[in-house]
A protein has these predicted regions:
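Signature for HUH/AEP ssDNA processing cores
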Residues: 1-151, 158-181
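Flexible helix-coil linker/hinge segments at domain or subdomain boundaries
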Residues: 174-199
């Protein structure tokens, strides 16, 4: 997703007033740094519109990822509402997450790393995500946000738990790991600092 309105809309769905989050950009190339590298920056909710503006200064990049759980507001000082080459600078760790707001389920076709999915593989992943959504809905789960990554699909369930939840989210993700099959890999992303693509 590179459209400014779509990025802003997604971030406003994921975060709320007072939140701080990290944006990470893979294989970025800028006028100042011509080799592919990772860019990282911290943004607060009040400056969400600065994210697409920061992306505009990059000449190219492969993907944009965001920590969907809010981080310690002190981390904003690392790169205030801007991107910078990550280099040896620290990025978000699990201990930097202040609250769990999302449970992520990633459905991707099984394929070699770096290879895009075929149309049939992509549809298979979308069908698997729809099936999981339907199964969980029948168990009383709410409707998730479902996103299409272009290769697969991701389900995002709103939760409200402390960052250190005693392993509750991990236990939940382990219980549903059986949904993987020969064609589609299901990854329940339980680590609190896990990021997701902005597609």
């Amino acid at each position: 997703m590179t459209d400014a309105n779509e990025i802003t809309h997604a971030l406003r769905l994921w975060f709320q007033v007072g939140d701080v989050f990290e944006v990470r950009v893979l294989d970025a190339v800028s006028a100042d740094y011509r080799r592919e590298h990772i860019e990282s920056g911290y943004f607060d909710y009040e400056h969400i519109s600065a994210v697409p503006e920061a992306l505009k200064r990059l000449l190219s990049f492969r993907g944009v990822y965001v920590t969907v759980n809010p981080v310690n507001p002190d981390l904003l000082a690392r790169a205030v509402n801007r991107l910078r080459p990550a280099g040896r600078n620290p990025t978000t760790a699990d201990t930097d997450i202040v609250r769990r707001r999302w449970l992520l389920i990633d459905c991707d076709p099984k394929r070699a790393s770096g290879v895009s999915s075929t149309k049939a593989e992509h549809e298979s992943a979308l069908a698997k995500a729809r099936k999981i959504r339907s199964d969980l809905f029948s168990l009383g789960w709410p409707d998730p946000i479902m996103t299409d990554s272009g290769n697969g699909a991701q389900l995002m369930y709103r939760i409200d738990l402390p960052a250190t939840d005693g392993g509750l989210v991990q236990k939940c993700t382990n219980a549903f790991a059986r949904a993987s099959d020969d064609a589609v890999s299901i990854e329940w992303l339980w680590r609190p600092a896990r990021s997701t693509a902005t597609n």
